[in-house]
UniProtKB/Swiss-Prot annotation:
Residues 42-114, 172-183, 193-307, 508-550 have a biased composition (Low complexity). It comes from Candida albicans (strain SC5314 / ATCC MYA-2876). A lipid is attached at residue 613 (GPI-anchor amidated glycine). The lineage of its organism: Eukaryota, Fungi, Dikarya, Ascomycota, Saccharomycotina. This is Hyphal wall protein 1. Residues 614-634 form a propeptide. The keyword Signal applies. Its main location: secreted. As a major cell surface protein expressed during infection, HWP1 detection can be used for diagnosis of invasive candidiasis. HWP1 epitopes can also be used to develop vaccines for protection against candidiasis. The GPI-anchor is attached to the protein in the endoplasmic reticulum and serves to target the protein to the cell surface. There, the glucosamine-inositol phospholipid moiety is cleaved off and the GPI-modified mannoprotein is covalently attached via its lipidless GPI glycan remnant to the 1,6-beta-glucan of the outer cell wall layer. The gene is HWP1. Residues 40-307, 412-570 are annotated as: Disordered.
Length: 634
């Protein structure tokens, strides 16, 4: 069957008309998609077809107006005006020609250096001065007189002969050092000594007198040794018998001065030796020898040597309260030597500090008890409140009583008295409680009520443990509410401490007072926001339609404890909100998981993909129909 041209044109027109309606389906789908977006996310995105109209009509039209009228017009006004001010500034440099007038004064100043030519005439007087140094050649003749002076030091060679006599000196003090008392050393500078001036005359005479006849004669030898640092100044007497050196000093002459001490050795008889200056005329020609008397007592009494030293009187002036008083203090050293040597030294004290000690009371009974009273301090405490002050006295001190056992008691004043009957509510330490599915309803989040203290809490409560409540077990909680805690009457000794409770979304929470068996079957949508997924040990899967909200509320302690050891995966159904409940004082940080939120009001419009798929299917269907009709007609 063949069709006419008119029929073919009509069929083609019909086909084109059918094909023209297909984009309307796409446009309808885009419009409905925009409506869905507006309902779900509260914003509306305009179709892409509207952008060309905005760019061509509104935006391009605004820019020519701004660039051509406002902005370019302002610059010509600002720039020409500012440069116009610069020609006025060159007027300031016009003042500089006036300043060069000041340098005109400098030609006048060079006239002053013109006065210097007369000054060079003054240095001309210096040539006569070089003639003055010419007088110095006679001065070198003066040092020529020094050659006779070296002849004077030539007289010194006889002087080295004098130090030649000194070698015996170092040998002399070694024998006398142990016999010299050390107490005399500070008195050495007080008495001047006269050195011997005649070293060439040896001492050969010694006069010794004995008060009584003795069976053994004393032989005296006079070697050239001396008892001091001056050579040939004193003569020691030595005998083969045992010697006891005794010295009685009649003057304050130090022991190290020459001719001051002469040791005397005697046998069993009493021997007194007196050395005078007349008996040894050659030893000390220019100094006087003090008389040294040595007495040896009988052998039955111990020998005692008493030496009197110089004493010093110190005047101490003490001033206090504008009044000064003077006191004399005598200082010195007294040494008494017997079988035992005792040294007593007196040192004045500048300040006297009284020391007071309380006597210890001792009981005569078998147990020894000592009570010591320490000094007490009275402290006045002034307390002010509401414009009124009160004073109170507090006595502090320490009392120590020692018996068989030592007990220390210390009193310390307290600044504030805290009554011991105060008790802190223990609502922040509720026991860990796992709520099974459908066991207890919770309260909406966002409402905060104070926790009631427990009446009985054992001391063996453990650390906080996260609490997981299965999904769909409780009515949903709107985010931001806090449920109050209900006091617990009796808790066993093995209950755990506060634990964060994880409540699945989609359930409504009410105060956990008495348990109720109301099923949790009321899902309610939650506004979109930041969702938090619980970070627990078990794997928790939440679909896109669920929203997690964070809630902080103290747990409602109950008498029923469900097993909390199950770590299986918790599956949260769609259209549910997982609410994280942190109980006690231990916050729980939850991991944020962005989820999709469906529209609050369900729309009868299908998703965009449905319309896109429908459009594509319609195009394919119409194309196949057209091809079939064309093939059928041809």
């Amino acid at each position: 069957m063949r069709l006419s041209t008119a029929q073919l044109i009509a069929i083609a027109y019909y086909m084109l008309s059918i094909g023209a309606t297909v984009p309307q389906v796409d446009g309808q789908g885009e419009t409905e998609e925009a409506l869905i977006q507006k309902r779900s996310y509260d914003y509306y995105q305009e179709p892409c077809d509207d952008y060309p109209q905005q760019q061509q009509q509104q935006e391009p039209c605004d820019y020519p107006q701004q660039q051509q009228q406002e902005e370019p017009c302002d610059y010509p006004q600002q720039q020409p005006q500012e440069p116009c001010d610069y020609p006025q500034q060159p007027q300031e440099p016009c003042d500089y020609p006036q300043q060069p007038q000041e340098p005109c004064d400098y030609p006048q100043q060079p006239q002053e250096p013109c006065d210097n030519p007369p000054q060079p005439d003054v240095p001309c007087d210096n040539p006569p001065q070089p003639d003055v140094p010419c007088d110095n050649p006679p001065q070198p003749d003066v040092p020529c007189d020094n050659p006779p002076q070296p002849d004077v030091p030539c007289d010194n060679p006889p002087q080295p002969d004098q130090p030649d006599d000194n070698p015996p000196i170092p040998n002399i003090p070694t024998d006398w050092i142990p016999n010299i008392p050390t107490d005399w050393i500070p008195d050495i500078p007080e008495k001047p000594t006269t050195p011997a001036t005649t070293p060439n005359i040896p001492a050969t005479t010694t006069t010794s007198e004995s008060s009584s006849s003795s069976s053994s004669s004393s032989s005296s030898t006079t070697p050239k040794t001396s008892a001091s640092t001056t050579p040939e100044s004193s003569v020691p007497a030595t005998t083969p018998n045992t010697s006891v050196p005794t010295t009685s000093s009649e003057s304050t002459t130090p022991a190290t001065s020459p001719e001051s001490s002469v040791p005397v050795t005697s046998g069993s008889s009493i021997l007194a030796t007196t050395s005078e200056s007349s008996s040894a005329p050659a030893t000390t020609p220019n100094t006087s020898v003090p008389t040294t008397t040595t007495e040896a007592k009988s052998s039955s009494t111990p020998l005692t040597t008493t030496t009197e030293h110089d004493t010093t009187v110190v005047t101490v002036t003490s001033c206090s309260n504008s009044v000064c008083t003077e006191s004399e203090v005598t200082t010195g050293v007294i040494v008494i030597t017997s079988k035992d040597t005792i040294y007593t030294t007196y040192c004045p004290l500048t300040e006297t500090t009284p020391v007071s000690t309380a006597p210890a009371t001792e009981t005569p009974t078998g147990t020894v008890s000592t009570s010591t009273e320490q000094s007490t301090t009275v402290i006045t405490v002034t307390s002010c409140s509401e414009s009124s002050c009160t004073e109170s006295e507090v006595t502090t001190g320490v009392v120590v009583v020692t018996s068989e056992e030592t007990v220390y008691t210390t009193f310390c004043p307290l600044t504030e008295n805290t009554p011991g009957t105060d008790s802190t509510p223990e609502a922040s330490i509720p026991p860990m409680e796992t709520i099974p599915a459908g066991s207890e309803p919770s309260m909406p989040a966002g409402e905060t009520s104070p926790a009631v203290p427990k009446s009985d809490v054992p001391a063996t409560e453990s650390a906080p443990v996260p609490e997981m409540t299965p999904a769909g077990s409780q009515p949903s909680i709107p985010a931001g509410e806090t449920s109050p805690a209900v006091p617990k009457s009796d808790v066993s000794a093995t209950e755990s401490a506060p634990a964060p409770e994880m409540t699945p979304a989609g359930t409504e929470t009410k105060p956990a007072a008495p348990k109720s068996s109301a099923p949790a079957t009321e899902p309610s949508p939650v506004a979109p926001g930041t969702e938090s997924a619980p970070a627990g040990p078990g794997a928790s899967s939440s679909p896109k339609s669920s929203v997690l909200a964070s809630e902080t509320s103290p747990i409602a302690p109950g008498a029923e404890t469900a097993p909390a050891g199950s770590s299986g995966a918790i599956t949260i159904p769609e259209s549910s909100a997982v609410v994280s409940t942190t109980e006690g004082a231990i916050p729980t940080t939850l991991e944020s998981v962005p989820l999709m939120q469906p529209s609050a009001n369900y729309s009868s419009v299908a998703p965009i993909s449905t319309f896109e798929g429908a459009g594509n299917n319609m195009r394919l269907t119409f194309g196949a129909a057209i091809i079939g009709i064309a093939a059928f007609l041809i």
